[in-house]
Amino acid sequence: MQLETSYLGTVKYKQEDIIVFQGGLPGFPEETEFILLPFNEQPPFYILQSVRTKEIGFVCINPFLFWPDYEVELADSVVRQLSAESEQDVAIFVFLTIQQPFSKSTANLRAPIAVHAKKRFAKQLMLDGERYSLKAPIHTAGKGGR
């Protein structure tokens, strides 16, 4: 199948590439199916692209590459909702807000995305407390960056 995207133009994908967010993402309840695409084939950056709407795509990263001490404890209910057997079945990503220059970009460490890589279910989480920032500067990554 082919998909038009704002960030990457036309991309090919398979049905089994689709990640399902039951109930959608906060603010986008109608958007339940996404694919995770490497951004210009340059990990660690990815695009979480809506299958339904070309204009809805989010830049995201694996936060552990930038903030090694980042911690996400998944509630048992979340593990079950993702049809996972344990937390080890789940990959974590965070959304970026890209700014110019790039050094002013930020990551939302308080609301990560949990993705069951094999079963392709996902959920956006909201971490309790003030430990992590909604706008953690990328330039502080690796320095605590909370």
Swiss-Prot record:
One of its GO terms (biological process) is bacterial-type flagellum assembly. Interacts with translational regulator CsrA and flagellin(s). GO terms for cellular component: cytoplasm. Belongs to the FliW family. Acts as an anti-CsrA protein, binds CsrA and prevents it from repressing translation of its target genes, one of which is flagellin. Binds to flagellin and participates in the assembly of the flagellum. This is Flagellar assembly factor FliW. It comes from the Bacteria. Keywords: Bacterial flagellum biogenesis, Chaperone, Cytoplasm, Translation regulation.
